[in-house]
Amino acid sequence: VRTGLQLRPLKSGGSGVQTYSKKHPQQMPTALEAGTLNGHGIAGLDAALDYLKQTGMDEIREKEQTLMWQFYEGIRDISGVKIYGDFSQKNRCPIVSFNIGDYDSSEVSDELFEGWEISTRPGGHCAPLMHEALGTVEQGAVRFSFSHYNTDEEIETAIRAIEELAQDEE
């Protein structure tokens, strides 16, 4: 920190340096540390950064895009499935949101987990205005988020599961 510049801590509280003092330490950098540092988080962040450098963001992005498009192509023509979003762009966020008929999104998500151990995020996704615009305030939507850790086989299983659920809804 530049000489003469005063920084105020975002939070203050216990300190590992002056444990029993009722006043927060004033010396830097301890003055900016409230409580115990998240050592596990710091170590995890370091490992994550090493992994990203080794694997490469381009490789990760390409894999996520490939899986997302595989999934989209696999469900887009299933009767009763309504997909939300702009799929006219080749590169997009590797997320697909959809509904199956009038099926509540939470029910679809539960069925996917119970029948196929597929984890999804149903509901309003902290985006009430989006759901208002889509007309899905009551139903919500089912969201698949793809990672480069997912496999082609997992995507094919998800497509088959959605086909089966859509048939059951008819």
Give a label for each model feature.
Residues V1-E170:
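Pyridoxal 5′-phosphate
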